[in-house]
Swiss-Prot record:
<keyword id="KW-0687">Ribonucleoprotein</keyword>
<dbReference type="GO" id="GO:0006412">
    <property type="term" value="P:translation"/>
</dbReference>
<keyword id="KW-0694">RNA-binding</keyword>
<dbReference type="InterPro" id="IPR047863">
    <property type="entry name" value="Ribosomal_uS8_CS"/>
</dbReference>
<keyword id="KW-0689">Ribosomal protein</keyword>
<dbReference type="Pfam" id="PF00410">
    <property type="entry name" value="Ribosomal_S8"/>
</dbReference>
<keyword id="KW-0699">rRNA-binding</keyword>
<comment type="similarity">
    <text>Belongs to the universal ribosomal protein uS8 family.</text>
</comment>
<keyword id="KW-0934">Plastid</keyword>
<dbReference type="GO" id="GO:0019843">
    <property type="term" value="F:rRNA binding"/>
</dbReference>
<protein>
    <recommendedName>
        <fullName>Small ribosomal subunit protein uS8c</fullName>
    </recommendedName>
</protein>
<comment type="function">
    <text>One of the primary rRNA binding proteins, it binds directly to 16S rRNA central domain where it helps coordinate assembly of the platform of the 30S subunit.</text>
</comment>
<dbReference type="GO" id="GO:0009507">
    <property type="term" value="C:chloroplast"/>
</dbReference>
<dbReference type="InterPro" id="IPR035987">
    <property type="entry name" value="Ribosomal_uS8_sf"/>
</dbReference>
<comment type="subunit">
    <text>Part of the 30S ribosomal subunit.</text>
</comment>
<dbReference type="GO" id="GO:1990904">
    <property type="term" value="C:ribonucleoprotein complex"/>
</dbReference>
<keyword id="KW-0150">Chloroplast</keyword>
Length: 132
């Protein structure tokens, strides 16, 4: 069994949301950095920073909650394309999550982008995950 970096990151964020944790720590790779930038830009996380200890670098996400009950902004994170079953889509067939409320994160020839950017640039790719 190989390492699925995206699934590990999604699981860490999901578990932290369930426990109402302030921060989450995930290994830093180019892929996780790019996904973190998208989550920050779309308003799903408060911020993130990169730290290094003993040649191991990792990202620390500060999660975003709303209201007195501290409901998480990220209600669902779902991995779509998996190492055993890759899912690809052209720009015309990219699914809309919750009628456009959520986002689809794609890996394209132009980098890691959201579904809106992919439609705008008319580029398809591998559907990594849904966020809403």
């Amino acid at each position: 069994m190989g390492n699925d970096i995206i699934a590990n990151m999604i699981t860490a964020i999901r578990n932290a949301n369930l426990g109402r944790a302030e921060t989450v720590e995930v290994p830093a790779t180019n892929l996780t950095r790019n996904i973190a930038k998208i989550l920050l830009r779309e308003g799903f996380i408060e911020s993130f920073s990169e730290h290094q200890e003993n040649k191991n670098s990792f990202l620390i996400f500060i999660l975003k909650y709303r209201g007195k009950k501290r409901k998480p902004y990220i209600t669902t994170l779902r991995r779509i394309s998996k190492p055993g079953l890759r899912i690809y889509s052209n720009y015309q067939e990219i699914p809309r999550v919750l009628g456009g409320t959520g986002i689809v994160i794609l890996s394209t020839s132009r980098g890691i982008i959201t579904d809106r950017e992919a439609r705008q640039k008319q580029v398809g790719g591998e559907i990594l995950c849904y966020v809403w």
